[in-house]
Curated annotation (Swiss-Prot):
Name under which the protein is recorded: Glutamyl-tRNA(Gln) amidotransferase subunit A
Gene that encodes it: gatA
Family from the record: Belongs to the amidase family. GatA subfamily.
Active site positions: K79, S154, S178
Gene Ontology molecular function terms on file: ATP binding; glutaminyl-tRNA synthase (glutamine-hydrolyzing) activity
Protein source organism: Psychrobacter sp. (strain PRwf-1)
Gene Ontology biological process terms, A to Z: translation
NCBIfam families, A to Z: gatA
Source organism phylogeny: Bacteria, Pseudomonadati, Pseudomonadota, Gammaproteobacteria, Moraxellales
Length: 499
């Protein structure tokens, strides 16, 4: 059973249900890989071996008693901004380095109730602010495809753990591309659901109107399995929408079964915007994404030209609104109630100032300053209010585009994974999100999936964007494509290592 980490979720479910292996055996397999190989990847902040083995034994006991729930006994892990009772929840920051959550986030409790086994908490950019996972207080995460490169961010630990074969799937959060960009860099499938589809209760906030929890897996079907217990209304989250949750796995399987064998995408209109293929797009990314679109076309899809807001305008809007919300959300970390507190403060003002300046990293401080400036009395209308008006125009441009098409396709990121310690200036790093942030501003669902590789073997992602509540359609559109291609089946160098 040395290759259990190569199996899809569907095959792992089948193996557990038919007792080819137990949850304890499966959990031990993944824990052994983590303990042996994660020293060079650094994807985990906390490994909960004792809790995982207890949960695995409980899952096996439930199965022996006749419970055959789909996720029962499957190992997984959470991004470290989801509160997890009894475990460290740090959000990748020094300011929370000793914080043990007294309660579970809604998605954590939902996944636990479904029977999945949490192996621990995953590394991330500090407070989800970053695109390379180098800003974590717990050290940079390394890309399992090439350990000298970044995994993307901010959910870099989640992506790296799945790509390395440490967990079959993982949770992440996406504020401006923090699931999709790491999925692209690590050769995975990652979905950011419609805003309001998944509860944010217990998720440490970066920008509340943009944050959304989602999933990583090797395939769209893998993502669908984990998204199922996560989705749904939660009265504890004011932004959660009360709307029926589809059966994501059944929907994509049904769509695949009903599709024409030769032209499964007959009738599907894929919108392509020239704005997504302009200045700054790497030539190899461009070629692979266009090749994937050609495959969709050969499988029956119709490519139609659409127009969306210039990504540079979208980028400027995002980096006005997101830091403004972060400035407000992170004001609670003051050194008084919980988290890091400086030593021997002279007075209350010194306590606030030193606790925050010592507890927050450089990128977080930068964004707090940007946001505070945008919200200041003299500039509120000139910057924040104007950005909110532009946000409405961005949403309207997407609505206009969806009158002509069913999904919109684009590169996920302008480049493949770049080198660690590249010392990118902040603006260059921010440009890495240029194709993903519009989705968050508009509250739309989007998925990234492998579309090919560079000549040096680095993964390249294709992004599909759906209209509001078309999460299931996106999963099906990705799943059927993956039935006709094999990009998602390729394994990283770390995943191929045996122990």
């Amino acid at each position: 059973m040395s290759d259990l980490h190569h199996l899809s979720i569907a095959k792992l479910v089948d193996g557990l249900q038919n007792q080819h292996f137990s949850s304890v055996e499966l959990t031990d397999h993944f824990l052994k890989r983590i303990n042996t190989l994660d020293k060079k990847v650094n994807s985990f902040i906390t490994i909960d071996e004792e809790g995982a083995r207890q949960a695995a034994q409980q899952a096996d006991d439930r199965r022996s008693a006749g419970d055959n729930s789909v996720l029962l006994g499957l190992p997984m892990a959470h991004k470290d901004l989801f509160c997890t009772k009894g475990l460290l929840t740090t959000s990748g920051s020094k300011i929370l380095h000793n914080f043990v959550s007294p309660y579970d986030a809604t998605i954590v409790s939902n996944i636990r109730e479904a029977g999945a086994v949490c192996l621990g908490k995953l590394n991330m950019d500090e407070f989800a602010m970053g695109s390379d996972n180098e800003s974590s207080y717990y050290g940079a995460v390394h890309n399992p495809w090439d350990l000298s490169r970044v995994p993307g961010g901010s959910s870099g630990g989640s992506a790296a753990a799945v790509a390395a074969g440490f967990v079959p799937f993982a949770t992440g959060s996406d504020t401006g591309g923090s699931i999709r960009q790491p999925a692209s860099f690590c050769g995975l499938t990652g979905i950011k659901p419609t805003y309001g589809r998944v509860s944010r209760f217990g998720m440490i906030a970066y920008a509340s109107s943009l944050d959304q929890a989602g999933t990583f897996g090797r395939s769209a079907q893998d993502c669908a399995y984990l998204l199922q217990p996560m989705a749904g209304h939660d009265a504890r989250d004011a932004t959660s929408i009360k709307r029926d949750v589809p059966d994501y796995v059944a929907d994509l399987q049904s769509a695949a079964a009903q599709a024409d064998a030769d032209k499964p995408f007959s009738g599907l209109r894929i919108g392509v915007a020239k704005e997504y293929f302009g200045k700054g797009l790497d030539a190899e990314v461009d070629a692979n994404v266009r090749a994937a679109l050609k495959q969709y076309e050969e499988l029956g899809a119709t490519i139609v030209e659409v127009n969306i807001t210039d990504p540079e305008i979208t980028l400027a809007t995002y980096y006005m609104l997101a830091p403004a919300e972060a400035s407000s959300n992170l004001s609670r970390f003051d050194g008084v109630r919980f988290g890091y507190r400086c030593e021997d403060p002279k007075d209350l003002a010194d306590l606030y100032t030193r606790s925050r300046s010592e507890g927050f990293g450089v990128e977080v401080q930068r964004r707090i300053l940007m946001g505070t400036y945008a919200l200041s009395a003299g500039y509120f209308d000139a910057y924040y209010t104007k950005a909110q008006k532009v946000r409405r125009l961005i949403l309207q441009d997407f609505k206009n585009a969806f009158e002509k098409c069913d999904v919109i396709a684009s590169p996920t990121a302008p480049t493949a994974a770049y080198k660690l310690d590249a010392a990118l200036d902040p603006v260059t790093m921010y440009l890495g999100d240029v194709y993903t942030i519009g989705v968050n501003l508009a509250g739309l669902p989007a998925i990234s999936m492998p579309a090919g590789f560079t000549e040096s073997g680095l993964p390249i992602g294709l992004q599909l964007i759906g209209n509001h509540w078309d999460d299931s359609k996106l999963l099906s559109t990705a799943h059927i494509f993956q039935q006709h291609t094999d990009h998602h089946t390729k394994l990283s160098a770390t995943a191929q290592e045996s122990i």
